[in-house]
């Protein structure tokens, strides 16, 4: 049999293939389509409010009766100090001027208008809404949340970008670890926002496999049978794909963003903190080049909240220079088939 069965049995799915939780790209329709293909769909809840999380969970359950993972950010929320307030004002002024110079009309929010939601609200929602799988990134859950979730029979999937992070997750009793290589698209799942591990995926996977006794999912660069086989040989028992689905019918990317993806070159794929305040891998553009090495980057989630309106305005203008188009290092042809078809094709290719 081609597929390892540890993850299948733990998660109650047919194939140990996981649709990556890509906030802003994956949709409830994508989650349901992944489930229909016999894979695990992942509902990206990021750092949404409890009410927003409930709405998306219920929408997903209307589309599928199969299990899916809810995915949340478990980041540290920086204290609002006088220094942060001053930097926020300067950054807001700089970004508004940058937008104006590039014919983007937008009013960015003040600090008082920004809502920050601790992940504990989402933990309560996930229990109340009877979700059975929770995946998380940007750190580790606190002990009390882990206990509550386990008491309610919820399987926990943590994200690591280093061996040390994997060991911390294992020590906390996390059921499954998702190993994210630095080549992966989107946000780095690192516990630290600043000094992120730089280790490549294959090196990291083999080392984590040697150090922990927890089933491993691998994320970063899987786009076909050869890449999946490579990480399977190194110990992965589950396989998370994101890039593969970026241009799918269920993707939230707009046509101009999908077209930009098709033309992307290797040297244009970069790590940046400019949009959100945390490192993420995506397509280099004017915004990144202007902001990345400036003093106008706030800590996450404040930078993310501040730039949100600018990104939305740029998207409405179909301006790829001021939106975050997240993509990993593995450049390939981006299929515009449905998520279900793309995943079934991957499964068929692997089983040949």
Annotate each language-model stretch with its function.
Residues 1-194, 198-211:
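Active-site entrance/lid segments in N-terminal catalytic domains of soluble metabolic enzymes
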């Amino acid at each position: 049999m081609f597929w390892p069965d540890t993850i299948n049995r733990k998660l109650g799915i047919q194939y140990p293939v996981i649709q990556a939780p890509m906030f802003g790209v994956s949709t409830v329709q994508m989650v349901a389509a992944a489930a229909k293909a016999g894979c695990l769909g992942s509902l990206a809840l990021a750092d949404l409010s409890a009410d927003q999380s409930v709405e998306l969970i219920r929408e997903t359950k209307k589309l599928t009766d199969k299990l899916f993972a809810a995915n949340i950010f478990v980041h540290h929320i920086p204290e609002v100090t006088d220094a942060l307030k001053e930097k926020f004002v300067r950054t807001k002024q700089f970004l508004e001027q940058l937008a104006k110079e590039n014919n983007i009309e937008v009013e960015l929010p003040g600090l008082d208008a920004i809502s920050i939601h601790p992940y504990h609200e989402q933990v309560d929602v996930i229990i109340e809404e009877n979700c059975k799988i929770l995946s998380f990134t940007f750190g580790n859950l606190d002990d009390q949340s882990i206990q509550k979730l386990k008491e309610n029979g919820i399987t926990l999937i943590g994200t690591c970008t280093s061996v040390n992070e994997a060991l911390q997750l294992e020590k906390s009793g996390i059921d499954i670890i998702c190993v994210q290589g630095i080549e992966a698209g989107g946000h780095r799942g690192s516990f630290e926002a600043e000094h992120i591990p730089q280790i490549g995926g294959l090196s990291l996977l083999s080392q984590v496999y040697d150090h922990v006794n927890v089933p491993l999912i691998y994320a970063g660069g899987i786009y076909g049978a050869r890449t999946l086989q490579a990480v399977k040989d190194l110990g992965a028992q589950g396989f998370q794909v994101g890039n593969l689905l970026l241009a799918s019918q269920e993707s939230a990317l707009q046509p101009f963003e999908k077209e930009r993806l098709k033309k992307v070159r290797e040297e244009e794929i970069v790590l940046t903190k400019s949009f959100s305040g945390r490192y993420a891998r995506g397509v280099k553009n004017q915004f990144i080049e202007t902001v990345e090495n400036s003093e106008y980057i706030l800590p996450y989630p404040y930078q993310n909240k501040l730039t949100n309106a600018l990104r939305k305005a740029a998207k409405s203008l179909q301006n790829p220079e001021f939106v975050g188009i997240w993509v990993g290092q593995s450049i390939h042809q981006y299929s515009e088939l449905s998520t279900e078809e793309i995943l079934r094709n991957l499964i068929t290719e692997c089983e040949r």
